[in-house]
């Protein structure tokens, strides 16, 4: 018998913070598919090639951006915490000019990151 030396990584659960899941579910199916793939990679400890660090929150907070029929959709998630992926925010970019994220979305992501941290710490995991 040959031992299995290629152990598959354990899939981390996804926890949705606030209205992130409800908002994500309003995205077009093609956008959900691509973002779902990115989240699936995060669950396995990998990173989607288009995922980029979310500015201001460090390397463990990532953003995936998808364009679809002239609209731009974003999902921000964190892999800061062991054994879980938290989706902090999912939103459609409203501005038609520039790439800057509206301040209200930036603030919401910061607040939800704090909620994710509190949730993680309440479970006694580190």
Task: For the regions a language model picked out, list residue spans one by one.
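Conserved catalytic cores of phosphodiester-cleaving nucleases, focusing on short active-site segments
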Residues: 86-90
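Hydrophobic/aromatic beta-strand elements that line small-molecule binding cavities or substrate pockets
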Residues: 75-77
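Basic, Lys/Arg-enriched alpha-helical interface segments
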Residues: 1-72, 81-84, 94-126
């Amino acid at each position: 018998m040959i031992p299995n030396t290629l152990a598959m990584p354990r899939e981390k659960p996804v926890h949705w913070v606030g209205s992130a899941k409800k908002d994500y579910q309003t995205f077009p199916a093609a956008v959900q598919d691509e973002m779902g793939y990115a989240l699936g990679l995060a669950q396995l400890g990998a990173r989607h090639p288009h995922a980029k660090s979310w500015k201001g929150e460090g390397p463990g907070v990532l953003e995936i951006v998808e364009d679809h029929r002239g609209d731009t959709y974003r999902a921000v998630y964190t892999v800061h915490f062991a054994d879980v992926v938290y989706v902090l925010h999912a939103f459609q970019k409203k501005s038609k000019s520039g790439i800057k994220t509206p301040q209200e979305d930036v603030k919401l992501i910061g607040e939800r990151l704090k909620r994710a941290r509190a949730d993680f710490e309440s479970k006694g995991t580190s």
